């Protein structure tokens, strides 16, 4: 009993499908009996075919800043009425809608005007949905590669305003009129990009009159997309490493000059920065229309490192100066030894000694005590015989020479210590200056644009 019921139901379903297929086959054969796909679907040639166009954005595939091409995945919805494709559902078993190949019917030749690469027209001919009133809905998928003027001035904190201009290629506004389905594209199925976010999307209809035919309008629908770049990738991989290189450059001035590693560290930082820039150069748009923010910051970092090397050479040269080659100007002594240490509170820095030996150690006339060892002033006109003794006089001259040499060496050492002290003061000043320049330079490059984006919300 149950088996027979199942077989009966299957038979009824099969019969329904066969009848439905027969009705649809008969309907399609009747509709296309005398149909021409090259003739506009109007009863009077003076009538205008009204085509409704809607754009559904599915995915933002790629933004090529160099070639200024935006690749998108879209669905282009087109609707119109073909009076040749109407029928009475009662005559065909209640069939109200059918799907037919789009190649078999007349279609508006809607193309992407600002196409940059590939095909201008839609190449995927999917089936259309046709109802008994002659209303046709065609939603083919397409990959559009549209031209977009990429402005890289604020890269990577940039916004781009790109557009898609759609219109019929051969029909003017007097025979085919295209109308936007909505004043903005459909973003209900949009898949978010990891690099871009769409802030605004609008559509406008334009009437364009060309000089060849000033009375004939040509219609187009232009969709504008305002896209903002997500800068996190560039902040982590470019900006922060450059900032760290700048701080590392500043630490060169904290390294003691006597260690002999100042230039080694400076050159190492420069080489590391050069290799880093060679690696990340492909991430930056290679265009000459403008210098992007990130390019300015990388240039600032490079100049910053090179300037530190040049100044380090000057500091090392100052550190190793001696009185035999350089005499310290009075203004240098006054500024770097007397003034700046007091202003900057260098209390832990030991200043070089400036005591000068002003008294002569020996004079030409030496008072020698009496041979008996009793001190006392010599008589008037008396000269000690020891002074006139050649051996004693030679010994005195030797001692005098040694004393003068020691005095000269001491003064030379004091002068050298003064130059080292000046170099140390320069190091401390430059450490603070370079740290400050690093922060101010970073803020000067990026702060203006970040404030502008914050105000825009």
From Swiss-Prot:
It catalyses: K(+)(in) = K(+)(out); Na(+)(in) = Na(+)(out). The chain crosses the membrane at residues 231-255, 263-281, 297-316, 429-447. It is found in: Postsynaptic cell membrane; Cell membrane. Disulfide bonds join 148-162, 212-213. Residues 317-428 are cytoplasmic. Glycans are attached at residue 161. It holds the Pfam family Neur_chan_memb. GO terms for cellular component: acetylcholine-gated channel complex; cell surface; membrane; neuromuscular junction; plasma membrane; postsynaptic specialization membrane. Upon acetylcholine binding, the AChR responds by an extensive change in conformation that affects all subunits and leads to opening of an ion-conducting channel across the plasma membrane. Belongs to the ligand-gated ion channel (TC 1.A.9) family. Acetylcholine receptor (TC 1.A.9.1) subfamily. Alpha-1/CHRNA1 sub-subfamily. One of the alpha chains that assemble within the acetylcholine receptor, a pentamer of two alpha chains, a beta, a delta, and a gamma (in immature muscle) or epsilon (in mature muscle) chains. The muscle heteropentamer composed of alpha-1, beta-1, delta, epsilon subunits interacts with the alpha-conotoxin ImII. This is Acetylcholine receptor subunit alpha. The lineage of its organism: Eukaryota, Metazoa, Chordata, Craniata, Vertebrata. The gene is Chrna1.
């Amino acid at each position: 009993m149950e088996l027979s019921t199942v077989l009966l139901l299957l038979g009824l379903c099969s019969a329904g499908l066969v009848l439905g297929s027969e009705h649809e086959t008969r309907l399609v054969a009747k509709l296309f009996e005398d149909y021409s796909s090259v003739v506009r679907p109007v009863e009077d040639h003076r009538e205008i075919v009204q085509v409704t166009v809607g754009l559904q954005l599915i995915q933002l595939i790629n933004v090529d800043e160099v070639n200024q091409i935006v690749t998108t995945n879209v669905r282009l919805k087109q609707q119109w009425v073909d009076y040749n494709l109407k029928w009475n559902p009662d005559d065909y078993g209640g069939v109200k809608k059918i799907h037919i190949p789009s190649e078999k019917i007349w279609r508006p030749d809607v193309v992407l005007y600002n196409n940059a690469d590939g095909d201008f027209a839609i190449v995927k001919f999917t089936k259309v949905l046709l109802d008994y009133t002659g209303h046709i809905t065609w939603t083919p998928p397409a990959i559009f590669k549209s031209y977009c003027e990429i402005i890289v001035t604020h890269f990577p904190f940039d916004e781009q305003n790109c557009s898609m201009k759609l219109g019929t290629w051969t029909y003017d506004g007097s025979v085919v009129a295209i109308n936007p389905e909505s004043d903005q594209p459909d973003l209900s199925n949009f898949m978010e990009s990891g690099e871009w976010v769409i802030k605004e999307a609008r559509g406008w209809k334009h009437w364009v009159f060309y000089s060849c035919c000033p009375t004939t309008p040509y219609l187009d629908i232009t969709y504008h997309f305002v896209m903002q770049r997500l800068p996190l990738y560039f902040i982590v991989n470019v900006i922060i490493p450059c900032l760290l290189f700048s701080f590392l450059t500043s630490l060169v001035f904290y390294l003691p000059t006597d260690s002999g590693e100042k230039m080694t560290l400076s050159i190492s930082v420069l080489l590391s920065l050069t290799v880093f820039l060679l690696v990340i150069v492909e991430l930056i748009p290679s265009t000459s229309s403008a210098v992007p923010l990130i390019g300015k910051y990388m240039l600032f970092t490079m100049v910053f490192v090179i300037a530190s090397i040049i100044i380090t050479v000057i500091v090392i040269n100052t550190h190793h100066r001696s009185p035999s080659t350089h005499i310290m100007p009075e203004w240098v002594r006054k500024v770097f030894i007397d003034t700046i240490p007091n202003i900057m509170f260098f209390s832990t820095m030991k200043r070089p000694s400036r005591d000068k030996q002003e008294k002569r150690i020996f004079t030409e006339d030496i008072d020698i005590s009496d041979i008996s060892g009793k001190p006392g002033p010599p008589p008037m006109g008396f000269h000690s015989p020891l002074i006139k003794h050649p051996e004693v006089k030679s010994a005195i001259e030797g001692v005098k020479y040694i004393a003068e040499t020691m005095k000269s060496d001491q003064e030379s050492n004091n002068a050298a210590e003064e130059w080292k002290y000046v170099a140390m003061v320069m190091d401390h000043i430059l450490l603070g200056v370079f740290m400050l320049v690093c922060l101010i330079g970073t803020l000067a490059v990026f702060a203006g644009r970040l404030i502008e984006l914050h105000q825009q919300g």
